[in-house]
A protein has these predicted regions:
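Acidic/charged, solvent-exposed loop-and-adjacent secondary-structure segments enriched in E/D, K/R, S/T
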Residues: 110, 114-143
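N-terminal mature ectodomain segment of secretory-pathway/periplasmic proteins
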Residues: 12-119
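Surface-exposed beta-loop interaction hotspot
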Residues: 148-149, 153-154
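Well-ordered beta-strand positions enriched in small/hydrophobic/aromatic, beta-favoring residues
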Residues: 46, 77-79, 110, 155, ...
Length: 288
C-alpha cells in the first residue's frame, strides 16, 4: 500500500488527525457505511461538458446530458455524450449526430450498458475488464463513473487528516478476490472522503505494482435546488499526464424521474428526443 500525498503532508495542527498512526478500523467502517448511504434527494438532470485535454494535442469539448436517481439505495445513471454533433453536407442533407449512450448502476445490482446512435442493434452489456476502457476518447472509463470501489468489501481505514484545508478520511480499497480480470490491472484504490460534506473529493487508482495510474478530483461545491453538487470533476492520467474535465453546465435537482428512463430500451433513442416526464419530489414539513 503506497503512502498517500496527504500522509507525506501530514498536518499535526489538529489533535483529531490520525493518518500515519493506527486508526480505529471500527470507526472507519462506520464512516464508510455512512458515506455509502448518502445520496441526493430525488433525481437530477445535468447538462454536462467533457473537455478532453491531451498534453500534446488539441483540446476537444463534447456536450452531453446526464440523468441520475437511486434504485433501492443504489445510484443509477443514464448519460448521452455527443461525439459528433448534427451537421449538413454540401447538398444540404442532414448528417445525424453520433451519440454515445450509457446506462449504468453502481453498488447493489451493478451493471453497465452502452449503445451508439450510429450503430444498429441492441445495447451492449459492458462487463469484465471492458469497464476500464476509455469512453468517448476521454480519460474517463465506466469504472471511474460507476466508482465500484466505493462498495468493495475489503478495505483499510488509513485515518483522518487535513486535506485542502478540510478534515478528510482516507481509505485504501482492495479489489474483490473473485474478480481475477480486474486484479490483473488494479492493485488498489485510495479514497479521500471530506468529513464536512461527506463527499468523495479525490480518488487515486493504482496498478498491481502500486504505481499511480490516475487521479480523480472535484473542484468547487455549490448548492443547486438546496443540494450540494460539485462544479467540475477532473481525471488525470498520471502516466501520460493527459487530462479530462467533466463540467456541470446546468443542473436541476430533487426531480421525480420515470422508471423507464433507466431501462435498456431508453438506450435506443437519444435523451434529447425522448419525451421524459419530469416532476418535482414532494417535500413535507411537520407543522407543530
Amino acid at each position: 500500500m503506497p503512502d498517500s500525498d496527504a500522509q507525506r503532508r501530514l498536518s499535526r495542527g489538529s489533535p483529531l488527525d490520525t493518518l500515519g498512526e493506527n486508526p480505529d478500523q471500527e470507526q472507519g467502517w462506520e464512516i464508510l457505511k455512512t458515506f455509502r448511504s448518502m445520496g441526493w434527494d430525488g433525481g437530477y438532470r445535468w447538462r454536462i461538458q467533457l473537455k478532453i485535454m491531451p498534453r500534446r494535442q488539441k483540446t476537444v469539448t463534447l456536450n452531453g446530458l446526464m440523468y441520475g436517481d437511486r434504485w433501492d439505495g443504489s445510484p443509477i445513471t443514464r448519460v448521452d455524450i455527443v461525439e459528433n454533433p448534427a451537421d449538413v453536407d454540401a447538398q444540404g442533407e442532414l448528417i445525424e449526430s453520433e451519440t454515445l449512450r450509457l446506462l449504468f448502476r453502481s453498488g447493489r445490482g451493478a451493471f453497465a450498458m452502452t449503445k451508439r446512435s450510429d450503430v444498429s442493434g441492441p445495447p451492449k452489456v459492458v462487463d469484465g475488464s471492458a469497464v476500464l476502457e476509455p469512453i468517448a476518447g476521454s480519460e474517463f472509463a465506466l469504472f471511474d463513473l460507476m466508482a465500484p470501489y466505493v462498495y468493495w468489501p475489503r478495505f483499510r481505514y488509513e485515518g483522518r487528516t487535513t486535506f485542502r484545508g478540510s478534515p478528510t478520511h482516507l481509505f485504501w480499497m482492495y479489489p474483490p478476490e473473485e474478480d481475477l480480470e480486474l486484479k490483473k490491472r488494479i492493485g488498489g484504490v485510495r479514497l479521500y472522503i471530506n468529513d464536512q460534506f461527506n463527499v468523495l473529493i479525490q480518488t487515486q487508482v493504482f496498478d498491481t505494482e502500486e504505481t499511480l495510474l490516475k487521479t480523480i478530483y472535484i473542484s468547487g461545491i455549490e448548492r443547486v435546488d438546496g443540494q450540494a453538487i460539485f462544479k467540475e470533476m477532473d481525471i488525470r492520467n498520471d502516466v501520460t499526464r493527459d487530462k479530462t474535465r467533466l463540467k456541470i453546465v446546468d443542473a436541476s435537482m430533487g426531480l421525480s424521474l420515470p422508471k423507464n428512463l433507466f431501462e435498456a430500451q431508453s438506450l435506443m433513442e437519444n435523451l434529447q428526443t425522448q419525451n421524459i416526464a419530469i416532476g418535482r419530489e414532494e417535500r413535507f414539513e411537520v407543522v407543530e
